[in-house]
Amino acid sequence: MRRRAAVIILIISLLITGLAVASPMEDAAKAYARGDYKTAYRLNKSLAVQGNADAQFNLGIMYDNSQGVPQDYSEAVKWYRKAADQGHAHAQSNLGRMYALGKGVPQDYVLAHMWFNLAISRFTASEQEEREKTGKLRDITASTMTPDQIAEAQKLAREWKPKKEK
């Protein structure tokens, strides 16, 4: 009986005061911000393999920029694609950049244009600056493409559907 009362008091006190427990994603962001890339990588990797698009995007950034891991554009593309496939706008923009530059993938302006279009359509109102930057990248890419290539990229973007990680 005494144990039950203690548990009830503990539950009530936790409900009243709230739990100040940071999420693994918050811990990863804090580690990254302070330059502790090994910890950020470990925490993001754990979440990424579970299908967390933000963590997948973060791993892409880390491989792209050699932060806590050796620079590996193919690995960056792998993680950007996992997040982009789920509709992550920043990952879509970065994946478009990788295709435009041929980093980690064969250069492909049609796919670059497609990913830029998708990102532009998914950025929120508070991400207007990112939308504009991505729009400029798309326009630069389009300037190297034929009208048929642009039409193909637009068709691919229209037909694209997000995938949920399993």
Residues covered by each model-derived region:
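Bacterial N-terminal signal peptides
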Residues: 9-17
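Hydrophobic face of amphipathic alpha-helices that form TPR/SEL1-like repeat modules
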Residues: 24-31, 43-47, 58-65, 94-101, ...
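Short helix-capping/linker turns of helical repeat alpha-solenoids
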Residues: 31-36, 44, 49-52, 65-67, ...
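Bacterial N-terminal signal peptides that target proteins for export
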Residues: 1-9
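Terminal, low-structured helical/coil segments at or just beyond the last alpha-helical repeat
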Residues: 128-166
